Amino acid sequence: MKIVVLAGGLSTERDVSFKTGDMVAKALRENGHQVILLDVFMGYSDKKEDLTGIFDRSEEVSVKVSGIPEIAPDLAKVKASRKDQSDNFFGPNVIELCQMSDIVFMALHGENGKIQAAFDLFGIRYTGTGYLSSALAMDKEMSKKLFLSAGIPAPKGASMKKADCSDDITKLGIQFPCVVKPCCGGSSIGVSIAHNAEEYKAALDEAFRWEENLIVEEYVKGREFSVGVIEGKALPIIEIAPVQGFYDYKNKYKAGSAVETCPAELSEAVTEKMQHYAEQVAQVLGLDTYSR
């Protein structure tokens, strides 16, 4: 098959996405497919004639990927480095290349459904969840409302907009310690744990650096787990134990910063309960094929 692995984009998780896309592209090539790893924002060339026979030189034209930096990318610099200086989310020839493929593998992180909606309009086949479920899953406020309405437990919390922000946590009915996070971010970028009023104010400032809307939740001390779901069925549970601090951007992607154990050491009853909730989440949000 001719496959475009779509990665990068104008997202704070841009670098993480490249690493994901690179691993996917290599695995697909090993299985005999012609694969192009493509940056959705930068695109490829600005000449239509350069697309002729492009899948026959797929590795040559693919994005070259190195390691993941310890800090999130500066998106202003990314935008400034684009050759055509366009504000179009799709780089040159991205739509054309995707239309030439048999399917697009979505390796983007922080995707909110907009690309899926565009691909639906263009008739481009892609992997994973459609536009509506992607948008819901990316929005923590909306997804939490759906979880609670379905009886899926979630931490006590409140949403806040920058325009009506207050640094008085008592107005939210939440006590310290608390977690402050952007509403639609990923990879723990902009996430802080605040233990007092001074840390809370700093946490608000940090979260608002990335987004106009944020979530403030009670801090639940405990272990961290990840549960994948494929075709509605939960996979074995992974426990993630950061060596230091919480599972932030640095600990997620720096080698040796966290210890992962699979299957997690849990009782059978707890394992079944967690897997049940993971399957419920996928069902409530309408997530197709795979989720985590």
Residue ranges and their predicted role:
Residues 1-132, 136-138, 142, 161-169:
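ATP-binding N-terminal substructure of ATP-dependent carboxylate-amine bond-forming enzymes
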Residues 1-7, 11, 15, 19, ...:
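Active-site nucleotide/adenylate-binding loops and adjacent lid/helix of ATP-dependent enzymes
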Residues 1, 6-10, 268-292:
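ATP-dependent carboxylate activation and anion-phosphoryl transfer catalytic cores
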Residues 125-130, 154, 236-237:
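Short hydrophobic/aromatic-enriched beta-strand-loop microsegments
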Residues 39, 214, 218, 286-292:
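A short glycine-rich, hydrophobically flanked beta-strand micro-motif that places a catalytic Asp/Glu
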Residues 108, 182-183, 218, 282-286:
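Short Gly/Pro-enriched turn/cap motifs at secondary-structure boundaries
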Residues 195-276, 281:
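Phosphate-binding site of ATP-dependent enzymes
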